[in-house]
Every structure is written in structure tokens, then in C-alpha cells.
A protein has these predicted regions:
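Rhodanese-like catalytic fold shared by cysteine-dependent sulfurtransferases
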Residues: 2-8, 19-38, 43, 50, ...
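Hydrophobic helical h-region of N-terminal Sec-dependent signal peptides
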Residues: 13-18
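Structural scaffold elements adjacent to functional motifs in cytosolic proteins
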Residues: 52-54
Length: 132
């Protein structure tokens, strides 16, 4: 009977330690925010010091892009972000054609430590000015 109690207490202690360590994390996982084109436009009109990233290809960018956007194709984000986006707390607005690549780019930026990333989807839904 005493052995059983000791085992039970040891198991309880082990579980308490396990759950205690799990609770040690701050519980905050970095993520990006998904916003609409209208919300992105409102930020562009009201904020300063933001960056707009076009996550499409060069040829898509050349066909038309949002004024002020810099081209960093989604597949180049990890290689170019540190150099071209030195401020990891700066507001970064990301778009592509339909929203698939902007999601991938936004996720990659967050993995790289960027803290203020907003994905506003695709240019096909953009109702505002486009430059060529």
C-alpha cells in the first residue's frame, strides 16, 4: 500500500512539473492580422512610415501595382526581408494577386520576427488607384 501511494505521489509530482513548465511560456504567439482592402487604404491614408509589399512576380508588378509598393516576391521574403525591412516593428502591409501569396509572405515575416504585419489579400479586390 505504501509503495502504491509513493508511485501515485511521484506521478502527481511529475504531472505538476510537466504542466508547470508548459505554463512557463508567455502564451503570446506572434501572428499577422488579416484586414480588408478598405482597412489597408484607411491605414495608408492615416498612418506614416509604413511599407507596402507586393508579393507577386516582377511581370505582375509591372502590369500594375499599388502606389508606393515595393516588390518582394513571396518566394524571396526570407532572403530579402532583413536587408530591405530593417525595422521589425514598422507597419508592413502585404498584398499579392488573390491573397494566397500575401498570406505566405505575412507568415514568413512573422517567423522572421516582424511584429506589425497586416495582410490585405489580393489586388483583384483593390478598389483604389493602381499605377503602371
Amino acid at each position: 500500500m505504501l509503495k502504491r501511494n509513493k508511485r501515485f505521489l511521484l506521478m502527481l509530482l511529475a504531472l505538476a512539473l510537466l504542466f508547470g513548465c508548459v505554463g512557463c511560456s508567455d502564451g503570446v504567439s506572434a501572428t499577422y492580422e488579416k484586414i480588408s482592402g478598405a482597412e489597408a487604404k484607411a491605414l495608408m491614408d492615416s498612418e506614416s512610415g509604413y511599407i507596402i509589399i507586393d508579393a507577386r512576380t516582377q511581370s505582375e508588378y509591372d502590369e500594375g501595382h499599388i502606389l508606393g509598393a515595393i516588390l518582394i516576391p513571396e518566394y524571396e521574403i526570407s532572403a530579402r526581408a532583413e536587408k530591405e525591412l530593417p525595422d521589425k516593428d514598422q507597419l508592413i502591409l502585404v498584398y499579392c494577386r488573390s491573397g494566397r501569396r500575401s498570406k505566405i509572405a505575412a507568415e514568413e515575416l512573422v517567423k522572421l520576427g516582424y511584429t506589425n504585419v497586416k495582410d490585405f489579400g489580393g489586388i483583384i479586390d483593390w478598389e483604389y488607384e493602381i499605377v503602371k
